[in-house]
UniProtKB/Swiss-Prot annotation:
Keywords: Electron transport, Membrane, Mitochondrion, NAD, Respiratory chain, Translocase, Transmembrane, Transmembrane helix, Transport, Ubiquinone
Membrane topology label: Multi-pass membrane protein
The protein's name in its UniProt record: NADH-ubiquinone oxidoreductase chain 4
Stated role: Core subunit of the mitochondrial membrane respiratory chain NADH dehydrogenase (Complex I) that is believed to belong to the minimal assembly required for catalysis. Complex I functions in the transfer of electrons from NADH to the respiratory chain. The immediate electron acceptor for the enzyme is believed to be ubiquinone.
A Pfam short name: Proton_antipo_M
EC identifiers of the protein: 7.1.1.2
Compartments reported by the entry: Mitochondrion membrane
MF-aspect GO terms: NADH dehydrogenase (ubiquinone) activity; ubiquinone binding
Gene encoding the protein: MT-ND4
InterPro entries cross-referenced by the UniProt entry: NADH4_N, NADH_Q_OxRdtase_chainM/4, NADH_UbQ_OxRdtase, ND/Mrp_TM
Any one Gene Ontology cellular component term annotated for this protein: mitochondrial membrane
UniProt similarity note: Belongs to the complex I subunit 4 family.
Bilayer-crossing regions: 21-43, 58-78, 93-112, 116-138, 145-165, 196-216, 224-244, 257-277, 285-305, 309-329, 341-361, 379-399
């Protein structure tokens, strides 16, 4: 554990002390090295927890998410180079330091076996994210987006803190493996239900559940590219991971606790997919598609079967890589045309032919084309939900159909059609961008060959 966390923390002096010429090279290479070392966590184990320290441990649910979080840091640095070109050196260093600060907190959140540490690191990721959005966002609305993010997250996580403290007074320990043996909140009383609700609510907002998702499109649209990648690929996964952890703690959920969440998640997957079909803003479209995918993850986590957990895990990892790649592609368009409106950025295929190949690949993985891991995840979740209740096949089937529709809509709008007249000169795509897309799609292609690495078998 420490052999990843300590090098990650040492990225801070690297960013602060590197000379101007080699600042990006040093930090990106160093973080790629950390990402490569973290791949050993995927090594299958016969023990439920490995690398155990008194506070942290890795099992098959957290290992894939930990590797994903290490893998994305160099990609965020690669993606941010262009839009920070005009900034003074001090601000570049500050930006890299802010990005790097989030990393140890995310690693701790995914590997904590102690609920207090989990809560602290879960909340600590909020501060650097807020700085990223409110300082490096593009429009003045970024302040409103930051306030939405802050208040949604804080209001939902205060009951979580109270319940964690209540658990500690009730049982005397907050060690997760111990709590899993006791199932502390199994009462059918209203207090038990309220405690369960308080535990779940913080993660439902983070995931986000439909109805509690209003902060997400705002935050995504206003954030810089690194902020969007961070939100889509890692912070939403913190919500999904928290739900899986907490539902394991609570044992079988009562009907009155799980039904509303299940109904909202599945209905939300349908509604947000429909919203995507009439979006004009590219980043907003990708943000709503994230809500739709995470709705399936929430629904799967709520029914608490091995198959559903496995499907939720695969979907979280696949969606992390896919949506991050889509945001990078949207950003490459934005940097050239200075617009996110789909009507103003259409018909780019003749001008950027190689980029349109990446667009095609990203969209095909997003709409769950076989044999991608997205398809395996969606099928597993659909089967688990169908097994739990037959009518859910209508909702999941429609959601899948709408996903394919809005993905093709996004592809045709950005790549096809006549080129708008105001686009007179567009820079060619460069090697850095192609490397960035390759590093997104390469893990996806490799995971197709061995999806059990991320299937999180409990």
């Amino acid at each position: 554990m420490l052999k990843i966390i300590i090098p990650t923390i040492m990225l801070l002096p690297t960013a602060l002390l590197s000379p101007k010429a080699s600042l990006w090279t040093n930090t990106t290479t160093y973080s790629l090295l950390i990402a490569t070392i973290s791949l050993q966590w995927l090594n299958p184990t016969y023990f439920p927890h490995k690398n155990m320290t008194p506070w942290t441990g890795i099992d098959q649910i957290s290992a894939p998410l930990l590797v994903l979080s290490c893998w994305l840091l160099p990609l965020m640095l690669l993606a941010s180079q262009n839009h920070l070109q005009q900034e003074p050196l001090v601000r570049k260093r500050t930006f890299i330091v802010t990005l790097t600060t989030i990393q140890p907190f995310i690693i701790l959140a995914f590997s904590a076996t102690e609920l207090t540490l989990f809560y602290i690191s879960f909340e600590a990721t909020l501060i650097p994210t807020l700085i990223l959005i409110t300082r490096w966002g593009n429009q003045p609305e970024r302040l409103s987006a930051g306030i939405y993010l802050l208040f949604y997250t804080l209001i939902s996580s205060l009951p979580l803190l109270v319940t964690i403290l209540h658990l500690h007074t009730q049982i005397g320990t907050l060690h997760m493996p111990t709590l899993e043996l006791t199932h502390p909140l199994l009462t059918h009383s209203w207090t038990g239900t309220l405690s369960g609700l308080a535990l779940l609510m913080a993660f439902m907002v983070k995931a986000p559940l439909y109805g509690l998702h209003l902060w997400l499109p705002k935050a995504h649209v206003e954030a810089p590219i690194a902020g969007s990648m961070l939100l889509a690929a890692l912070l939403l996964k913190l919500g999904g991971y928290g739900i899986m952890r907490v539902t394991l703690l609570m044992g079988p959920l009562t009907d009155r606790l799980s039904y509303p969440f299940l109904a909202l998640a599945l209905w939300g997957a349908l509604m947000t997919s429909s919203i995507c079909l009439r979006q004009t803003d590219l980043k907003s479209l990708i943000a709503y598609s994230s809500v739709s995918h995470m709705g399936l993850v929430i629904a799967a986590s709520m029914i608490q079967t091995d198959w559903s957990f496995s499907g939720a895990m695969i979907l979280m990892i696949s969606h992390g890589l896919t949506s991050s790649m889509l945001f990078c592609l949207a950003n490459t368009n934005y940097e050239r045309t200075h617009s996110r409106i789909l009507l103003l950025t259409r018909g780019l295929q003749p001008l950027l032919p190689l980029m349109s190949v990446w667009w095609l690949l990203a969209n095909l993985t997003n709409m769950a084309l076989p044999p991608t891991t997205n398809l395996m995840a969606e099928l597993t979740i659909m089967i688990a939900l169908f097994n739990w209740s037959t009518p859910t096949i209508i909702l999941t089937g429609l959601a899948t159909l709408l996903t394919a529709s809005y993905t093709l809509f996004m592809l045709s709008m950005t790549q096809r059609g006549t080129l708008p007249t105001h686009l007179t000169s567009i820079h060619n795509s460069n090697t850095r961008e192609h490397l960035l897309m390759t590093l997104h799609i390469f893990p996806m292609l490799l995971l197709m060959l061995k999806p059990e690495l991320i299937s999180g078998v409990i």
